[in-house]
């Protein structure tokens, strides 16, 4: 009975015809409304009082309201199933881009039987109809949201199937391995020894290496998509705001000789060597009785706790231990992988040391005001993040890396069961779980709530 209800729900969903504005809100020369579903062509013909133009050919039409009055005019394109984005009948109406006329046209389509599309519903239908896998569907949203040329190019590669191909190649190896293991379990009379010839162990290690290679590439794609949260911290007048301006390439923050000028956090989106960065300037860390400045310091510490990377700026001319401030305010977050020490105002020093390391921490000497050493700092930031994108880098998300991490965990368990315990059934179960985890990436094995969360983050018209 449950299966019948699930089938009916799926059937009813795709018997509806959906409509949405596909262009951004606001005024524009052209506004596009998209229809998809079994009644798309019928609804469009009622709207235009004419038959549709030939498939994939633009035709000029007038759009009529319920009283027969012309609401707008423009182009109509018809994409019959299955040769459309969604795999269903799709009609695109290209009229004028004013919000009033676009909303009026959309309301008219609803009167004619269309339903309002949910966020990401067009892409969801494309996924369900086999036009896209989950990685390609996500790449559409990533291409729209790309903040750099490199991110856009990587999103296009994922949309074209580069990431999916890598995952599917690993899955083929994993399925091949499972077949060998299952054969050894199902035909015990053949007395197949799991370790006799080392073949299964070699296949398992090959799969693990393949997953690791994809993980390395995906990490670069994740950095391109999600970027790095970088926080600048230090004492008042250490040159934090000057450093933000130098990295951003403009005077974003106010710079004065008065200590405590910066009292709130200041965020700036920039790109360093192609790596998207959210750069945050913070209030100077010191003891103060000023209530407003105290609140700024509290917010600064909160930003420090959440940062991917912290740039701790200190004044070289003071000769102080740069780590003393860190020990006082955020000792629990004092990790070499999250911290770069910045010795600033080197232009005021004669014969200043070019330190590359201070204790266990990376160190860079700069003059933010004079733009000395800034490129070396930029290189240090991207190197610290492990950012080394290749020409074939594809876009990736945190959930992809999480799925691969779980895949590796199950493969490690399978190896342990194989080598230590010779437990064939447990090896097979771990390999099954590894395949399920890896299949989540392309959507071959995905829970409904995961799909809803992914497509729910899309634009309405996608």
Swiss-Prot record:
Cofactor: K(+)
EC number in record: 3.6.-.-
Bilayer-crossing regions: none
Domain TrmE-type G: from-to ranges: 227-386
Residues given in the record as Mg(2+) binding sites: 241, 262
InterPro entries xrefs: G_TrmE (IPR031168), GTP-bd (IPR006073), GTP-bd_TrmE_N (IPR018948), GTPase_MnmE (IPR004520), MnmE_dom2 (IPR027368), MnmE_helical (IPR025867), P-loop_NTPase (IPR027417), Small_GTP-bd (IPR005225)
Binding site for K(+): 237, 256, 258, 261
Residues that coordinate or bind (6S)-5-formyl-5,6,7,8-tetrahydrofolate: 34, 92, 131, 462
GO biological process entries: tRNA methylation; tRNA wobble uridine modification
Subcellular location: Cytoplasm
GO cellular component: cytosol
Cofactor binding note of this UniProt entry: Binds 1 potassium ion per subunit.
Keywords: Cytoplasm, GTP-binding, Hydrolase, Magnesium, Metal-binding, Nucleotide-binding, Potassium, tRNA processing
Residue positions binding GTP: 237-242, 256-262, 281-284
GO molecular-function term, one example from the UniProt record: metal ion binding
Sequence similarity: Belongs to the TRAFAC class TrmE-Era-EngA-EngB-Septin-like GTPase superfamily. TrmE GTPase family.
Function: Exhibits a very high intrinsic GTPase hydrolysis rate. Involved in the addition of a carboxymethylaminomethyl (cmnm) group at the wobble position (U34) of certain tRNAs, forming tRNA-cmnm(5)s(2)U34.
Subunit and partners: Homodimer. Heterotetramer of two MnmE and two MnmG subunits.
Annotated protein name in UniProt: tRNA modification GTPase MnmE
Organism classification: Bacteria, Pseudomonadati, Pseudomonadota, Gammaproteobacteria, Moraxellales
Name of the encoding gene: mnmE
């Amino acid at each position: 009975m449950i299966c019948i209800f699930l089938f009916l729900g799926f059937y009813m969903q795709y018997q509806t015809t959906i409509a949405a504005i596909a262009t951004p809100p606001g005024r524009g020369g052209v506004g596009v409304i998209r229809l998809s579903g079994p009644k798309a062509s019928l609804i469009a013909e009622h709207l235009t009082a004419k038959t549709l133009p030939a498939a994939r050919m633009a035709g000029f039409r007038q759009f009529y309201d319920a009283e027969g009055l012309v609401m707008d005019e423009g182009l109509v394109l018809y994409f019959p199933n299955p040769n459309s984005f969604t795999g269903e009948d799709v009609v695109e109406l290209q009229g004028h881009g004013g919000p009033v006329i676009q909303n009026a046209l959309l309301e008219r389509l609803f009167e004619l039987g269309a339903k309002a599309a949910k966020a990401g519903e067009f892409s969801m239908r494309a996924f369900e109809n086999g036009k896209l896998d989950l990685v390609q569907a996500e790449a559409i949203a990533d291409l729209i949201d790309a903040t750099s040329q490199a991110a856009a190019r990587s999103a296009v590669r994922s949309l074209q199937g580069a990431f999916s191909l890598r995952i599917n190649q690993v899955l083929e190896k994993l399925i091949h391995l499972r077949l060998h293991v299952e054969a050894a379990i199902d035909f015990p009379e053949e007395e197949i020894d799991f370790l006799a010839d080392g073949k299964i162990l070699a296949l398992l290690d090959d799969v693990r290496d393949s997953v690791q290679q994809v993980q390395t590439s995906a990490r670069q794609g994740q950095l391109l998509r999600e970027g790095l949260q970088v926080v600048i911290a230090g004492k008042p007048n250490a040159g934090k705001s000057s450093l933000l301006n130098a990295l951003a390439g403009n005077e974003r923050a106010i710079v004065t000789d008065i200590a405590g000028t910066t009292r709130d956090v200041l965020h700036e989106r920039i790109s360093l060597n192609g790596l998207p960065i959210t750069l945050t300037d913070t209030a100077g860390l010191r003891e103060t009785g000023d209530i407003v400045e105290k609140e700024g310091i509290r917010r600064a510490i909160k930003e420090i706790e959440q940062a991917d990377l912290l740039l701790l700026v200190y004044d070289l001319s003071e000769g102080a231990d740069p780590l003393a401030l860190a020990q006082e305010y955020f000792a629990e977050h004092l990790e070499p992988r999250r911290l770069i020490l910045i010795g600033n105002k080197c232009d005021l020093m004669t014969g200043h040391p070019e330190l590359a390391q201070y204790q266990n921490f990376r160190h860079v000497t700069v003059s933010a005001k004079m733009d000395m050493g800034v490129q070396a700092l930029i290189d240090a930031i991207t190197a610290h993040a492990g950012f080394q994108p290749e020409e074939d880098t594809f876009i990736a998300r945190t959930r992809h890396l999480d799925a691969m991490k779980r895949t590796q965990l199950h493969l490690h368990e399978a190896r342990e069961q194989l080598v230590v315990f010779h437990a064939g059934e447990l090896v097979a179960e771990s390999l099954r779980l590894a395949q399920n985890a890896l299949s989540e990436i392309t959507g071959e094995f995905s829970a409904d709530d995961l799909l809803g969360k992914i497509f729910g983050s899309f634009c309405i018209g996608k």
